């Protein structure tokens, strides 16, 4: 296990690591909602509150969503869907995983020394500078990010090599499964954006420790430069988080609809490519309040709205794939339908925020929090749940209890919506982000939001119980539920240690 070069074992390690980190991240979010449940202070001052918020973001993004979607599902499914015997660089694959536990350890250490890194996950100077955050906390967080970044870059190189070099000779680009496409595009985005983040946080590190002035106006630097560099990474990053989810949802909807391919398969591929490309030219929409020229704001507003077009193509293609089919309303199907609906809601609030003039008012309010939690907590997480339930029988050879899964879906659906829908109202009413206290006019919606978070917590506990029950009762799977449109279901269930002794013949 520790030194395994098998893509299945490494994928399983990623799943276990992601689940553990997810529990840490969820605990942090419960602390946030407990603090905000009533006006007045519960935990302490805003420094400790901001440390919790910062750690919650980092843990959920870098140690939960990315390891599960890219590391877990990517490692497990890409070689199986390509008919490849393993990844292109199996030992580097192992190293990619083992960079993550030290990275997480450094991040958790940053919260425990001095007074913690209370900067928000963006690490903006001058708040993250040596003066405002003296001590080792921010430095530890920066090293943690470096390690996570190296891990992701190595993984990205590995996936790109695998997808280009290890597919069957007659698998033309439009025949490559959509999930493999999505992971390939994700890997490309990682490869192009992470070095910029590494440069930005390295400059921040030297500003803090080696007396440089990249972001210090007193020495001729500019803190806005940091924001440009960070968001040039930060915006592609949010597409990195959702693209593998897009690929998985495409497969699940095809599978559940009994169709042989998605509606507009080529259009789906080009939509993902367009999203990946456009993701790099919209970064300053995170900075509408820093005083950019009006023509710059106009460009970033327009470019951001253009991203809604390929995203809309994907959503309507999913709907068209389901059209006319007899849906079974199985658990993966429910998660996929929930994904399509809630991701659309999150996308619509994104179009609202894309308007630079409106964003001046809504920037740094709970409206933004509601927007990105709809696309992450109900986009990425719903995709993870859908994919996990869909492929769990393939990975383990065991079956989950379908009735309990539907009940668990209902509880989770209620919980996340109750948590994040009221935050739109809080944002429109002007409640700012990253404060541990608020005027009592905001109490009602915050109470509802906190109740929703507790319901979600119960739903997650129930899911852990469903998995435990499945493994302890050991119900073997006899055959897949439906004839499938992708080749991973032709494996034994669970697959053999080495799936392909020779390259399979793919005939269409």
Curated annotation (Swiss-Prot):
It is found in: Mitochondrion inner membrane. GO terms for molecular function: cytochrome-c oxidase activity; heme binding; metal ion binding. The keyword rRNA-binding does not apply. Its EC number is 7.1.1.9. O2 binds at residue 239. Component of the cytochrome c oxidase, the last enzyme in the mitochondrial electron transport chain which drives oxidative phosphorylation. The respiratory chain contains 3 multisubunit complexes succinate dehydrogenase (complex II, CII), ubiquinol-cytochrome c oxidoreductase (cytochrome b-c1 complex, complex III, CIII) and cytochrome c oxidase (complex IV, CIV), that cooperate to transfer electrons derived from NADH and succinate to molecular oxygen, creating an electrochemical gradient over the inner membrane that drives transmembrane transport and the ATP synthase. This is Cytochrome c oxidase subunit 1. It comes from Blattella germanica.
